Every structure is written in structure tokens, then in C-alpha cells.
Amino acid sequence: MKTLIGPKERLSSSLLWFTLLGSVAVSPALAQIRPMGVVPQATANQPKTAVPVTKTPTAKPPVPVTRTPKVGPDTLAPANPDFKADQPEAAQQAQVPAPLPPAMWDAGSAMELVAYIKQIGGDGLNPEDYDPEGLETAIQSGNVAAMSAAATERFDQVSSDLALGHVKKPARIDWYLTDKDLDSAKQDALLRGALARHDITAALNGLLPTHPQYAALKAALAATPPGDQARRDRIRLNMDRWRWLPRDLGEKYIIVNVPGFHATLVENGVNRWKQRAIAGKLSTPTPQLSATATGVILNPWWEVPKSIEHEAAGKKGFVPVKGADGSIQRWRQPPGPTNALGQIKFVMPNSKAIYLHDTNARSRFNSDTRALSHGCVRTEHIMDLATQLLGDDGGEWTPDKIQAALDSKKTVQANFVKPLPVYIVYFSDAALLDGRIVDYKDLYGRDPAAMAALKMKDGGASLAKPVDQVATPAKAKKAAAKPADQVATR
């Protein structure tokens, strides 16, 4: 059973990144941002050979068995509905090995950690959150045990924030992603390996995102004067959002940036396909999540969500689904030219029932502010995307076969040879190909809560509960009356 880290736990440094780019028209006056170099990676700690234990005549009390607590796959997101509370009891009660003795630090490594903390502002974090002065005092005391305890505590805090992000779940509004490659044992191995190699800096740098977007934001932060605190905070927040994401997005993946209203297919770090997208209205915001796309459905039925079934009930073109007692359970819309999903939708199961699909109102892609859906992502030219993916890896679905299926008017599912991940994210700052930063409108007002948590020492972990936000109709009406200025550029 896996336990994700808190301030005093340990975690892994498994890292790999790919490219997401902002896609908007920009002004010639935008400032250039130089690309950053490759971030060094931490090497894996070598396992030690087990030493046989010899029994002694003296009887010793039995070592108590520690059992893992019943926790979800992401303790940073306790409200994540993907968590299955009925996991097998045997897995929940797996025995945990006895902990290793505390890691012992030398003064040189501890001072290296102090120096690292003092420059961590370059990655958008606050050095004071890690109390470097307190560690310096412990070093000067000459007490190795006290110094080691203080250094380990700060190493855990820093490594946690670099790998997972400083902002915790209560301030991550509508956040449903998890990173499965984190546990305390791997963090402990990272620490002990760094001490053995006398290279704290490399171990911590290896936790940083290596994605070009992160490098561009870091360069923008360095180029922004201290007096422009609002801009610096916005950049810092979006750097932290990159730390929220898994390091390995996949060799090939789709990423949707909601504030930017665009979807991108990335393969081997290169943008292979990118188009405009329509996201959820203020009253039905699109959440941040990840899912695995296994294929597409051609000529799909639209299963009307319960939350909006009143819009379809009894109307022409909608079909009721009745239960055994004859009562109407839900409403469906059959395939056809008026179907809200258009000709195709992606099969990407997830707890929020969010997916990419076509639309029967393609002219809406020309709108400046494209917050128009019930939460799903309407994607421009999505048939082209599906055709590419269905033909990849020797797929049998040729363009002619796809067209024949569409012409049949029948509902058909076509599967990809290799499923691929889809990430729906929320970056209010992003970089263009040349490194210039684009400011997107904070569509759902998610920035303030996350910004406040970024400035808290505990990243908002002490907040009462997640503040997942659904705007009221009044707020939606008020926002709709504002000018459509969702994009500003630098």
C-alpha cells in the first residue's frame, strides 16, 4: 500500500517531461525568453546487500507489526472520487518493514542544503518556508544528531515541494489527477543516496520538471523585476502547477489547456497536432484530470447528464430510457446532424464523465471566449486527430474505413492500437515556441485560492476542505457581460 508524502515523509524522483505550448496570436513587442539548460537528474541509490542476522541467547521483545493506514492513491487529494474505499483488505493491511536508522548528515552536506534553500526562489518557492537559519544554527551547535534531524526535515520538505508542488489539494480547485510514482521509501532512498554521493544539489535538481514550459516560466521569473510582484506571483503559481503533474506524461499524449482553449497532440516532445477547443461554462467548469483514451465512437449517442436533463426532457429529437416500472430514468439523443456530440467522441473513462468530442455547432470555435460547454471539451477538427491516432501503430482503421462507418449512420467503436493518456490542465500562463509568455484569463477564478496557498508555509494543507468551485448562474451572467479579453500577451 502506497502512502504519498507529507512534510516529513519521503518520495521518489522518477522524472521525464514533454512539450506543451500556448497557442494564441501575439504582439511583436513581446519579450523574448531564453531557453533553459537541461536540468541534471538524480541517479538511483544502489541497494545494499542484506546481512544475515545471527540469533543471540538473550531474548528480545517482539517487534510490533506496523500496518499501512487505509488511504487513497493520492493523499494530497482526499476528495478524489477515483479512490476505491473497498480495496482488498490484504492490500490495506500489508506489513511494512522496520524503518532504517535516521540518516546521519555531515556538516558539508548540511551546508549545501542551506545554500540550496537560499536560492530556491529561482524556482518560485519561498526560502523562508524551509527555515535555513534554523538549520544553520543546528550545524553550528556541533550536535550531529540534532543537525541530522534538522537537515532531514528540511530535505523532506524541499523534495516534497519540488516533486509534488507546494500548493496542496485544498487549494487545487477541481483537481483530479494523481501521480502514482511516489512513496516514502523512494524518498528515503533519494536522501541516503545523496548523502552517500555528497551531492544534495543534484538529488534535489533531479526532482524539478524538465518540461520546456517550466524552463520558459523559470526564465520569465528571473527576468521579471522584484517590483512587479503580481506578475512574479502569477509565474510562480504556474511553475508550481507544472510540479503538480506527473513527470512522465507519456511518449504520446493529448493535453488540453482550458484557459488557452486549445488541445494538443504531443509525440516525442513535438507538437504533432493542435487545434482550438471549447471548455465548460462558468456554471459547469471543466475539471483538471487525466484519463486514458482507448479509442473513439463514431456516430455516438449523447447520454444527457442528469444535471441538465431538464433541457432535453420531452423535447423533439430526444429518446427516454425507461426502467422496469415504466418510469423515465434518463434521456438520450440519437446520432444525426443535430447531435450535440457531432460525429465522434473519444472513449476515455474517468470519474467525472469528461471527454473530447465533436460538435454540431462548429462556428462557435470562432468565439474569443470559448467557455460554452457543459464541461466536456469540444475539439475542432477532432476527426483529423482520430484519423491519425486510429492509423498509428499499424491500425486497421484507414480514412476510407472511417468514412464508411460514418456513412453507415450506425454507432461504431474504433479502438486505438495503443491507448494514450489525455491531460486536461489549467495554466493561466504558458509559453510560445519562441519562449514568450502568454497570460490567459483566469477563466474559472482558480488562481486566487492557489496563490494564497502558495504563500502559506504548509501550501494550504491546513485548509478545511477542497474548495471545488461551481459558479452560480448570477456569477456566470456577470462574467458573460465582461469584455472577451481572455488573452493577454508578453
Language-model-detected regions and their locations in the chain:
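Generic hydrophobic, helix-prone segments enriched in Leu/Val/Ile
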Residues: 25-28, 115-118, 130, 135, ...
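Cationic-aromatic interfacial patches
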Residues: 34, 39-44, 51, 57-180
